Structure formats: C-alpha cells, structure tokens
Amino acid sequence: MIQIDPRSSTPIYEQIIQQMKELCLKGIMKPGDKLPSVRELATIIIANPNTVSKAYKELEREGIIETLRGRGTYISENAKTTLVEGKMTMIKEQLKQLIIDAHYAGVELEKLHEWIKEISADVKGGKKND
C-alpha cells in the first residue's frame, strides 16, 4: 500500500499524504474504503504514530479522508473529485508560468501548440520523452 523511503529528503508525513493521494487518483483506493488506524499504519510502515496522525489530519483537512468516531477512517466520497480539481489548478498554474517563460524567450504561441501536439502524441503512443 504505502512505502516510505527513509532516505528521502521528503518528510515521512508528506510521503504518506502524496502516496494516499496517488492511490485515490489511480482508483486503487476508492470512496468508502477503510484505512488502517493510525497505530496500524505506523506499525506497517515503521513510523511514529504522531507522524501518521499528522498525515491523516492533513488529508482530512483537504477533504480526502474522513474519520467517523468509533468506526474508523475512510476515503471520502469526494476524494477523487477534490484531487482532480487540485491537479487541474496546479497544471493551469504551471501552464501559465510556461507561457510567460516562453513569451520572454521569444517562443511563438504557434510553436508551443506544435510542441504540445508532439508531446501529446508521444504520451498517447506510450513513448517517453527524456
């Protein structure tokens, strides 16, 4: 389920958050799925329960999970929608910055369109561009 890289510069609680979000976006974890308790997950990934609790609190604040007192913690019904909307907002901001950078570098909009089509074709074809 979740794999922590102790050598990573990313804090463990952020690794938990990111991986939970990825599992939801990929459809591996679905709305209504029950999560391990804080102590259970801490034992599984060999982390401090306070670290797992911090991740769960942030995921709950973002609307990805919900805790039902006495019943456990579950993936919220709106988790995927919330995550997709967040991703789209992030992509739009990145695109905006890219267009600004391209403008100052003298790259014409038509050239950007051409590159987008090329890269899109590569992605759809399963090719990787390094």
From Swiss-Prot:
Reported function: Negatively regulates ABC transporter complex ytrBCDEF that plays a role in acetoin utilization during stationary phase and sporulation.
PROSITE patterns referenced in this protein's UniProt entry, alphabetically: HTH_GNTR
One Pfam family it belongs to: GntR
Record has Transcription as a keyword: yes
Annotated transmembrane regions: none
Organism: Bacillus subtilis (strain 168)
Domain HTH gntR-type: 10-78
Protein name (record): HTH-type transcriptional repressor YtrA
DNA-binding region: 38-57
The entry's keywords: DNA-binding, Repressor, Transcription, Transcription regulation
Domain of life the protein comes from: Bacteria
Key word Transcription present: yes
Any GO molecular function: DNA binding
